Amino acid sequence: MAAPVGAQARKLLRDLVLRPPLLAARSQVVQLTSRRWLNLQEYQSKKLMSDNGVKVQRFFVADTANEALEAAKRLNAKEIVLKAQILAGGRGKGVFSSGLKGGVHLTKDPKVVGQLAKQMIGYNLATKQTPKEGVKVKKVMVAEALDISRETYLAILMDRSCNGPVLVGSPQGGVDIEEVAASNPELIFKEQIDIIEGIKDSQAQRMAENLGFLGPLKNQAADQIKKLYNLFLKIDATQVEVNPFGETPEGQVVCFDAKINFDDNAEFRQKDIFAMDDKSENEPIENEAARYDLKYIGLDGNIACFVNGAGLAMATCDIIFLNGGKPANFLDLGGGVKESQVYQAFKLLTADPKVEAILVNIFGGIVNCAIIANGITKACRELELKVPLVVRLEGTNVHEAQNILSNSGLPITSAVDLEDAAKKAVASVAKK
C-alpha cells in the first residue's frame, strides 16, 4: 500500500479540493466565488460521466410535474430521489417560495414525486449559498435511490506542485474531506500521475485498495478510477471530485455525487460542454461584465476595485481591509484592454448603489496605462461620476497616462503606490 500523505495532504486538500479562494486580513475574511466560470448542473455532470462508462444512478430530468411523474414510473425503482437542480449547495435544507421545505426528497410512491415536483418547478429555492430570494428551479432530477453500504472519497485534480494530475482518495467519504485531512491525515492517499504515460493499472489498483475495496470490488473500483481519469483528460477538467464514491449492498461501485471543474482556456475545443453553461443563475451584473470580457465578483463593501489581474485584485481587496475599508467588488480587466472596456467597467461599478468610492489599481505590463487613462476620463465625463475616484497607475506609458489624468480637469486623486491608494480610498469614504 502507498504511504498516506500527512501534512502535505492538508495543504493539498485545502488548496485544491473545490474550495473558493479566501482573502484574509486581520480577523476578517472575504470568500470569493466566481460564478462566471463554467458550472454544470448535477444532471449534466452525471450524464457526462454516464456517457463515458462511469457508473451512476439511473435518472431522468424533468421540467414539469407531469414529466417528473412519468419519469418516476419509468424508473420502476424501489425508492426514488427527487432533486431540485440549481448550482448552489445546501439544497437538502433549503426552502421553496411555495412553502415546501427541502430541495431533495426520498419517496417510494411515483405520485408523490409529481406532487413534490409541482411545488419545486417554477419556484425559488433559497439555501445558505443562494441570494436571500433564492434561485428559480427550472428542472428536477428524478433518480433511482440506491442504498450505500460504504462511502469513500475520490478526486482527480491538477496539482501545480506536481506539474500534472494527482489522484486523491480517502476511505472516509460522504463528509467534508477537509475535516478528514485535518483530523485524520493518515487517511488521505495520493497518487501522482504522469500526464504523458497516463494512469497505470497499478496506481488505480493501489488507490482502490487504499479506499478499502476488497475482492471483486477492488477491480471494479480500479476500473471506475481509470474511466474517471480518462474523462478528466477528455473534457479538459481541472478537477473531478466524487463524494461519495461508494459501494452498494448488491456489490456495485457507484459515483453517487460528482462535481467537475473545467479549464476555461479549453473552451475552444470543448464547445459542446461550454454550451451547457447555465448563466441564468448568475447575477445580471456578472453576465453583463462577461459580455465585455470582464471578470466581476460582487462583495458587500462600498469601495469598488478596478484592477488588471486576479492576483493584483486580491491584493487590492486585502490592502483595503488592512486600512479599515471594505471592497464592494472584484473586477479584473485582464490583459489586452480597450478604452471601451474601461468605460463599461465604470458603467458597471457606478450602477452599484453600494459603491461610495472607486479605486483603480493598474500595473501596465501588457496593459497600456495611457489607454486606461483615456478610458477613465471618458467614463468620468460621460457618466458624470459622482463618487470619489482614486487612481494608481504603474508601468507602460505611465507618464503619458498621468499627464492625461492631471490635464483632464477632473477631480481624480492620484496615488503613488497601492498602500497610498488604499488609504486615500478609505479616507474618501470616511469623510462622507
UniProtKB/Swiss-Prot annotation:
The modification Phosphoserine is found at residue 161. It catalyses: GTP + succinate + CoA = succinyl-CoA + GDP + phosphate. Substrate binds at residues 308, 365-367. The modification N6-acetyllysine is found at residues 73, 111, 132, 139, 200, 218, 227, 271, 347, 386, 423. Residues 46-274 form the ATP-grasp domain. This is Succinate--CoA ligase [GDP-forming] subunit beta, mitochondrial. GO terms for molecular function: ATP binding; GTP binding; magnesium ion binding; succinate-CoA ligase (GDP-forming) activity. The keyword Ribonucleoprotein does not apply.
